[in-house]
Design a protein with these regions (language model features):
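Hydrophobic alpha-helical segments
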Residues: 1-25, 316-318, 435-453, 457-460
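N-terminal leader/targeting segments
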Residues: 1-81, 192, 306, 481-482, ...
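Membrane-interface helix/helix-cap signal primarily in integral membrane proteins
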Residues: 2-5, 64-243
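Hydrophobic alpha-helical transmembrane segments of multipass membrane transporters and ion channels
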Residues: 9, 13, 209, 213, ...
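Divalent metal-coordination and catalytic microenvironments
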Residues: 18, 93, 147, 220, ...
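Alpha-helical transmembrane segments of polytopic membrane proteins
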Residues: 31-39, 352-353, 418-423
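Hydrophobic alpha-helical transmembrane segments in multi-pass membrane proteins
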Residues: 40-41, 47-49, 55-60, 176, ...
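Non-globular, low-confidence helical/coil segments that flank catalytic cores
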Residues: 94, 119, 132-146, 166, ...
Length: 554
């Protein structure tokens, strides 16, 4: 009972438990049964509200509600999906997104028509690779192209990344590639934010000559990563810096923090305003607006939406004079994300981001009483370096089990690379990106983007140097699902409780390590036609083909 005030932190955990059960099932539970069960358990929780069993009843109600909600969201997302390859066939549709400005480009088409499919069997969205786009084509334009369409790929191996599941919840029912050059059928509609994204990307591409630096700048500013050269992308991954390219909480937090500080400092220059009005709240409201605009500019993907929820809740706490940014805020953000997008629970981005944030907040709550003394004792610069080191270590350790589960690889020198790259991104690259974007309407973006390019060059040099070190990348069999679940349970127990019994969470982490250590890679895998084999005998994987995927293991 000593930690009764922490019980509420477990509410999203039980809701997530129900969602996790849904996605672990190999059959679709009838929606009317899960809805009835959710209603009955909710009534039971209400009945037990004055009983000592109320916490257990509420936990059960939330778990069943999560099971129902995941199924309900699946029904809402259900749409036609291509079941077999077809083509050549004429495909037309309106461009929803494109991943780059020029050259070979991947586009997502909505409102699609396929000449060889009836309307009721035509996917609502298609993802195509085409050699180029015709002049004047962009988001909102309608194009037509001769293409070959394929079903969305299944996991490459059992338990691996499932592109078909992700595509299902994004409304994408087929992939394919163009067999010729697309034709423009209708000019682009006025889709302001998409045209703005690509306009900013084009201006950056003209201002920064180096392709690698330009690709990173475009990715950080607009979320478009198609212009980043493959070699640079690989070096960034191998150095453990890939998170810098994926616009998430780090980036939105930096933008919101910089805007908040700038607006508050500017308003403080007028004593008559600063003394009479709540300028801090005005700055927080402006920062929320800036973060929302940045989310739209980055494509409003699920990770950026999740990050915006976190940032907005933190700034709303400032506006209502609740300055403590604690674990309740993290729990509320997780609840909001799971309600909006239950599928997010299964994604690497959700697991990595919330693992890092929860661990950082838990460590902050533990160290909060001594932070002021440490800052005065060390001085500003040493304290900042120590805080950066601690933040990097905590985030790396917290995300390691989930990175092992999803990727089966670690960047051995990622800690050192992040200690150099993250401060450069926070205090050099992102401020220059904001200034450059704001200066574009005046045509004055060249100088801020030159400063941004210099910072990106430093990060790229760090990535290339670190990734070239011997043993920079360590590969191993992915952690089994059971290990990831044990790590999540242990980590949550450590982070959500505050008394000594939180240390029982170490048992969950130890179990995760034991499960991972005992996992044995398959000796033999075969595709659905039994034409592709892989044998693990000397630690290597031997493939007869490289295009198919594995469906079973021996």
């Amino acid at each position: 009972m000593r930690e009764r005030d922490r019980w509420a932190l477990w509410l999203p955990v039980f809701f997530a438990l129900g969602i996790g059960v849904y996605f672990s099932l190999d059959f679709e539970p009838p929606i009317h049964i899960t809805a009835s069960a959710a209603g009955l358990t909710a009534l039971l929780a209400v009945y037990l509200r004055r009983s000592a069993l109320f916490p257990a009843g509420l936990a059960a109600a939330l778990a069943v509600a999560g099971l129902f909600w995941a199924g309900f969201h699946t029904e809402l997302a259900r749409a036609p999906v291509l079941e077999r390859s077809i083509g050549p066939t004429e495909v037309s549709g309106r461009i929803l997104r494109q991943n780059r400005i020029e050259g070979p480009v991947r586009v997502v088409l909505e409102d699609a028509t396929v000449s060889r499919l009836p309307p009721e069997r035509t996917p609502e969205r298609l993802r195509l690779r085409v050699a180029s786009l015709p002049p004047g084509a962009g988001p909102g334009a309608r194009i037509s192209v001769l293409a070959r369409l394929e079903p969305v790929p299944q996991p490459a191996m059992p338990g691996g990344y499932d592109p078909a599941r992700r595509a299902f919840y994004q409304g994408t029912g087929a992939t394919g590639f163009g067999l010729g050059h697309p034709r423009l059928l209708e000019a682009a509609e006025d889709r302001g934010i998409e045209r703005l994204r690509h306009g900013i990307a084009a201006r950056i591409g003209k201002a920064i000559a180096d392709p690698a630096a330009a690709g990173v700048a475009i990715a950080l500013t607009t979320g478009l990563r198609g212009d980043l050269p493959r070699a640079a992308h690989q070096a960034i991954r191998d150095a453990g810096l890939a998170h810098l390219l994926a616009i998430s909480g780090l980036h939105l937090g930096l933008v919101a923090g910089l805007v908040f500080a700038a607006v508050r400092a500017a308003l403080a220059l007028w004593p008559g305003v600063a003394l009479r009005y709540p300028v801090k709240k005005w700055a927080a409201a402006t920062a929320i607006a800036a973060a929302f605009f940045y989310m739209l500019l980055a494509g409003a993907t699920v990770p950026t939406q999740r990050a915006f929820v976190m940032v907005a809740l933190a700034l709303l706490a400032v506006m209502v004079d609740r300055l403590e940014i604690g674990m309740r805020l993290v729990a509320l953000a997780a609840f909001a994300v799971l309600i909006l997008e239950p599928y997010a629970l299964t994604t690497a981005s959700f697991q990595l981001s919330f693992a890092a944030v929860a661990a950082l907040v838990a460590v902050y709550e533990w160290l909060a009483p001594s932070l002021s003394e440490a800052r005065s004792r060390l001085g500003r610069a040493p304290f900042f370096l120590a805080a950066t080191l601690l933040t990097t270590i905590v985030a790396t350790l917290a995300t390691a089990p989930f990175a092992a589960h999803h990727f089966g690889r670690i960047a051995a020198y990622g800690l050192a690379a992040n200690l150099l790259a993250v401060p450069a991104a926070a205090f050099w690259i992102m401020p220059a990106a904001i200034l450059g974007t704001l200066a574009m309407p005046l045509g004055l973006e060249a100088w801020p983007l030159a400063v941004m390019e210099a910072g990106i060059d430093a990060v790229l040099w760090t990535a290339e140097t670190v990734s070239a070190l011997p043993g920079a990348v360590r590969r191993f069999p992915p952690m089994p699902v059971a290990g990831a679940i044990a790590a999540a349970a242990g980590g949550l127990w450590l982070c959500l409780w505050q008394t000594r019994w939180r240390l029982l969470g170490v048992a969950g982490l130890a179990a995760a390590l034991a499960i991972h250590a005992g996992a044995r890679p398959p000796d033999l895998m075969a595709d659905s036609d039994a034409r592709l084999f892989a044998r693990h005998a000397d630690g290597r994987l031997y493939l007869s083909k490289t295009r198919a995927g594995f469906l079973g293991r021996v």
